[in-house]
Design a protein with these regions (language model features):
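Catalytic domains of carbohydrate-active enzymes, especially glycoside hydrolases
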Residues: 60-81, 288-292
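Glycine-rich, proline-tolerant flexible connector loops at the mouths of alpha/beta enzymes
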Residues: 80-93
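Active-site region of glycoside hydrolase catalytic domains
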Residues: 2-45, 69, 88-90, 98-472
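Internal amphipathic alpha-helical repeat/solenoid segments
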Residues: 57-66, 87, 97
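Active-site mouth loops of central-metabolism enzymes
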Residues: 46-59, 134-137
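A common structural microfeature
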Residues: 12-14, 58, 75
Length: 472
């Protein structure tokens, strides 16, 4: 639909950007922090660094927050490292961890930047993983106790909470994050059992938040991608419906309505993946109500009908070589109408508008975008300049689509792209940069870790100062 005039961004719109603890903080074993599954990895993709130092945000957070304030951030979305708060995942609290995040929150508030806190962003305590991780129901209780500690210590200053970052990616690609035993006979059944436990843990955390912090707001943060059928063939359309139900709506239907959607359940039943559901689980899931939906969007996906020959589940290119098919259910396909970036990701700003509309139409909850950005091989040029016009173009095109979606009637209250500052990519090290701020280091040479404003820094600063009006 076209409009004569687009809606303006509201005055209280939360412009900001995002990071995660293990990708930006460093200080992996300092001040009492315990090891996470990320720290326990014994190998990394060839030519990429580990996460031990990262961007050294732990020691430089004041400098970083000052730069965020200079950009004009209204909000900053970051994650808390579970093992910095409770080193063993359950049990004793680490005072130094409480102190660090308390200081970070205070520093943000000093500049009138709203903290948006992700409670769990891939970095499960390794002590819990060694006991079975999310496969064990005991982690539900451990997560609830961890949540209570966060609410007790930071709830007086944090209004916005995100439960679990990209739970659907942890399930769809479980072997990539160190939370799945690759030797299991039926690893996908185990993943969907882990998923059920995470969903119950999330529901308990949402209920606890509303009980302890009645003025706070909490919601899930999945990765959502619009799914196109590869053609107008009815079989391709059904395949796209299947992919949508399994990849996207399974997680949000559970978070919002406390029920497994029929397509996802039929898929799990057919494949032998249905989880064990204990008495009381569904009541807990139905009782929990998010206040908003946060979601991450980078690209859309395309699906075609299964070929029925066992070849559906195959890597479809891109830098992460993630599998995007399910035998007999759908098959991942390229979209010939979209351009790709250097890492093989299809760029689809209009699909972002459609995604916003579809989520809002389905759930009627306010939306905030908590990741959206462009990874690239940024080059530091003479006079400390980084001319990342490609990032400006990507972010600009996506923000324009937020404005279109708002004119469509979608309630969007914030935008926090990935990432505020260069950090370590989960799969591609520090060479794949996302930030508005350049961190002067290489994969294996820390150099001086100096912070350098990219061209996109100044562009985003102007955009925020105009509350989006400079788009036009």
């Amino acid at each position: 639909m076209n409009y004569n005039k687009l809606a303006a961004f509201p005055e209280n719109f939360l412009w900001g950007a995002s990071t995660s603890a293990y990708q930006v903080e460093g200080a992996w074993n300092e001040d009492g922090k315990g090891p996470s599954v990320i720290d326990a990895r014994d190998s990394y993709p060839e030519g990429t660094t580990d996460f031990k130092v990262a961007s050294d945000h732990y020691h430089r957070y004041k400098e970083d927050v000052a730069l965020f304030a200079e950009m004009g951030f209204k909000a900053y979305r970051f994650s808390i490292a579970w093992t910095r708060i409770i080193p063993g995942g359950d049990g004793d609290i680490n005072p130094k961890g409480i102190e660090f995040y308390s200081n970070l929150i205070d520093e943000l508030l000093k500049y009138k930047i709203e903290p948006i806190v992700t409670m769990y962003h891939f970095d499960l305590p390794n002590a819990l993983q060694e006991k079975g991780g999310w496969s064990k129901r005991s982690v539900i209780d451990a997560f609830e106790r961890y949540s209570k500690v966060l609410f007790e210590h930071f709830g007086d200053r944090v209004k916005y909470w995100l439960t679990i970052n990209e739970q659907n990616m942890m399930i769809l690609h479980g072997s990539a994050l160190g939370t799945l035993d690759p030797n299991l006979k039926n690893p996908k059944k185990e993943l969907y059992q882990q998923n059920h436990h995470m969903l119950v843990a999330q529901a308990k955390a949402m209920n606890l938040c509303h009980e302890m912090l009645p003025e706070a707001k909490i919601g899930p943060a999945p990765n959502i991608a619009l799914i196109y059928p590869a053609s107008s063939k009815p079989e391709d359309v059904v395949a796209a419906f299947n992919y949508n139900a399994i990849r996207n709506w399974l997680y949000l239907d559970m978070a919002v309505h406390g029920r497994y959607n029929t397509t996802a359940w039929a898929y799990m039943k057919e494949k032998g993946y249905t989880p064990v559901i204990e008495d009381g689980d569904m009541e807990i899931l139905r009782s929990a109500k998010p206040d908003f939906i946060a979601f991450n969007y980078y690209t859309s996906q395309t699906a075609e009908a299964s070929r029925g020959d066992g070849s559906d589940e195959a890597a479809r290119g891109g830098d992460q070589h993630l599998k995007t098919g399910e035998d007999g259910v759908y098959r991942g396909s390229a979209n010939p109408n979209l351009e790709k970036n250097d890492f093989g990701w299809e760029i689809d700003p209009v699909g972002f508008r459609s995604t916003l509309r579809e989520i809002y139409d389905r759930y009627q909850l306010p939306l905030i975008i908590t990741e959206n950005g462009l990874g690239a091989f940024d080059q530091l040029e003479e006079n400390d300049t980084v001319n990342d016009d490609y990032r400006i173009d990507y972010v600009k095109q996506h923000i324009e689509q937020i404005q279109w979606a708002m004119t469509d009637g979608v309630d969007v209250f914030g935008y926090s792209p990935w990432s505020a500052i260069d950090l370590i990519s989960t799969h591609q090290g520090c060479s794949k940069r996302y930030g508005f701020i350049y961190v002067n280091r290489d994969e294996f040479d820390l150099k001086d870790l100096r912070r350098i404003r990219k061209k996109s820094f100044y562009w985003y600063k102007e955009l925020i100062a105009s509350n989006g009006a400079s788009l036009n």
